[in-house]
């Protein structure tokens, strides 16, 4: 609903990614069909990294996917949906890698403010750069090295 209330610049397309057993999946699909912007709802995807690389902005929880978004330099408005996400949210916001929002209204307010001030591209670029600097994206190699497995 928040995105539908904002006059987004350009020709935005909205992609919502959910788990295949998400309790609100059907309700979200129904709402996507009534959005003023073209919207699709995907469930149980196997190409999340690709979806992230073609996105300009993510709105998502400060859980484990937050690190994937950082690895790809994807600007993010993050929500804390569980207690164990609080420290991640604080750390990412302190690093300038994500901005924490508490409610859908706050999402709409932030976007409206950026658009009104013609700041969208600058804010997203800054968030993306900071996000990319949080992780080097070579975690697999680090784990392999720590396990003492020789390179192939």
Residue ranges and their predicted role:
Residues 1-152:
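Nucleotide-activated sugar donor-binding and catalytic core shared by glycosyltransferases
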